[in-house]
Every structure is written in structure tokens, then in C-alpha cells.
Amino acid sequence: MMGTILNPYFGEFGGMYVPEILVPVLKQLEKAFVEAQHDPVFQQEFQDLLKNYAGRPTALTLCRNLTKGTKTKLYLKREDLLHGGAHKTNQVLGQILLAKRMGKTRIIAETGAGQHGVATALACAMLDMPCRVYMGAKDVERQSPNVFRMRLMGAEVIPVEKGSCSLKDACCEAMRDWSANYETTHYLLGTAAGPHPFPTIVREFQKMIGEETKCQILAKENRLPDAVIAAVGGGSNAIGMFAEFIAEKSVQLIGIEPAGNGIHTGKHGAPLRHGSIGIYFGMKSPIMQTQDGQIEESYSISAGLDFPSVGPEHAYLHTIGRAQYESITDDEAIEAFQALAKHEGIIPALESSHALAYALKLIVQNPEKEQLLVVNLSGRGDKDIFTVDKILTEKGII
């Protein structure tokens, strides 16, 4: 791709597959990002906001009860404690500072679970930027607490009634808005996917998750973990955790996609293991698509994982074998959600519950194995309590 400063590809994945009208805008964004990375004033403001507004560094918490009777030590990286309730706040602050640097006067965003929307709304309120959030109508219904939070903080929330009324449709509407208003508007993309330079920007603005984890685990255990585990939808919390450990070959990187009702049912959101390569959302990456290239509907109980593609760096890490990607069903995630609440007094987001469920599987499979695991607890579960309550009530569990 001619004229980019940074490499727009991760192996064969990534790129900038957008209408011609948006190419100069993406190049402007890339230039602003590269300059900001080398600007001590920008970095100082970003770090100050992370520390004094968002509440970094976040804790690394040892599970005291979940691993009883086993030889595993399980730590949780507590992104749920970040202001806004999830890891999303990290990169939102960075992108809004970039937007201001470029002279943009309006922010738009897409959101699935509502966490990125909340993070965008709170940061826009604090940094005094008008904000519009596109959200699938289905997600507006299942994430009503977050919709109220966004509106309370001054964001305009637009329910998207098209297609499957989910995250992919919200992404499409946000792209349409941006294409029409790019001169004044910054599209604050919420995950490590989309056209270049978004996957790189989001990784760089999330990588403090892994950097902090590395320092914290060395201080507590005097060694690196055997594995770090994170849920993967678009992939921002996972790449934020993985980035610092990619060069540490002794550390397994495990990403967890949503198996939904089970891979065999077709109702899942696992394009890495069960999709095929194509062009979607401005990038080349694995997608859930039909044989004639129509995008299939993804499914997960977790709105934030309900996405038919995945960030290109994850596709690359999967292809070269540096990271492994597994899947967890809705039922397994709900069990993990309950277990963490009951035994550790922490209510995780359903997204994070997928990663936790896989960690618990590893522990149960080999209780005598001495292992040190870290799960990225990417968000808190307040937004999911009504969904889980309904399911458990229907099953007669509560």
C-alpha cells in the first residue's frame, strides 16, 4: 500500500480497503498518530488521564478460592476496575486526544456491549467533544443500563434497525456517517480491527495492559506466567494483553472466541477457527461468510464478542502459531460468571467470562500441574446481570 508511514499489514492480513474518499483521512490519522507517539506533551497528557482519570495501573488479583485443591495460581488483570468498567477507556482517551490534535470537532463510535460507547461518552464529556454512538437495536435492548449511561453523559445513541441489528450493522452505519462527515468527524473505532491504521493505533493505546501485567507478575511471583488468556471479539483487550508477551516465547498466548450455542450449530462468533479469509470492515481478515461471500450473522450471549470478523494481528498470530485460539460456549461462560461471583466476590463481564471459563477448564483438566495463569478480566458484569438473571431464572437455578 503506497504512501503509508507504518506497515498496514500483519503478514497477509490488514490493509486499507475503504472508499477512495477515506484514504486521505486514514493517512492524516496515521500521520497524527506517528507524530503523537514522539510528542512528549501528548504522551504526558495521555499518561496523566490514564492515571488520574481512568485509574491506572489496574490491580493484578490472585484468586484465593477458585483454585483450591489444585496446584494452579490464577491471577486476574482487573480492567473491570478501570473508570467506565472495562479496558475500552484506555484507547478511547488516546484517540480523542488524537482527534483534537487533528482539529476534529465531533466524535462518532460503534458499540456492541455498550462498554466502548460508555467509554467514548465519558471521555467526550470530560474532553468536551460532541458524541454520537451507533448501536444495534438488539444490543440497545440487551444492554439498557449502558444505553442510559451513555445518554446521561450527553451522547446521542442511535439504534440501528438494519440487518441483524447487531455490532456489524452499527459498524456499517458509523462508516457511512464518517464517509459523509470526515472533514469534521473522527470515527473512534472500538476494537483492534478495521482499516489501517486502526489495528495498530488500538494496540498501542491498549498495550499498557500487558506491560503492567508483566511488571506485576514478576513482582509477585518472580517469573513470567505460563499463559495469558483473553477473550477475542474484534480483539482489543487480547492484543493489549498479548503485545508485551509476544517476544516471550515461554508464555502461551490464548485467545478465546465465542462458541455461542456450539460451533456445530452455526450460531457462534468464531471466525478465526471457523471462518474464511475475506475483505470486511476495511480489512483483510478471517470472516464468517457464506460460499458466495455474504457476511453471516455471528452469535454470542456476549454482545461485545458478537462480531463476524477479527482483528488482523490476531489472524497473523494464529497463522504463524504464536497464539492459539479456542472457543467457549454461552453455557460455559455463564458457569464461569457465576463461579467468580460466588467464590471471589467479583462479577465479570460475559466477554471476560469466556476467558475465565477456558482457564478453569485448563485447571480442572490437570489439577496436579503447577501452573501460573493470568486472565485478562476485561470488564465488569453489571451490564450483564439482567441477561444472566433471565437465563438462570428460566433454568430454575435462581
Swiss-Prot record:
Belongs to the TrpB family. The modification N6-(pyridoxal phosphate)lysine is found at K88. InterPro entries: Trp_synth_b_CS (IPR006653), Trp_synth_beta (IPR006654), Trp_synth_beta/beta-like (IPR023026), TrpB-like_PALP (IPR001926), TrpB-like_PALP_sf (IPR036052). Its EC number is 4.2.1.20. It comes from the Bacteria. PROSITE patterns: TRP_SYNTHASE_BETA (PS00168). The beta subunit is responsible for the synthesis of L-tryptophan from indole and L-serine. Its cofactor is pyridoxal 5'-phosphate. Pathway: Amino-acid biosynthesis; L-tryptophan biosynthesis; L-tryptophan from chorismate: step 5/5. It catalyses: (1S,2R)-1-C-(indol-3-yl)glycerol 3-phosphate + L-serine = D-glyceraldehyde 3-phosphate + L-tryptophan + H2O. Tetramer of two alpha and two beta chains. Coiled coil: none annotated. NCBIfam families: trpB. GO terms for cellular component: cytoplasm. Keywords: Amino-acid biosynthesis, Aromatic amino acid biosynthesis, Lyase, Pyridoxal phosphate, Tryptophan biosynthesis. Pfam families: PALP (PF00291). This is Tryptophan synthase beta chain. GO terms for molecular function: tryptophan synthase activity.
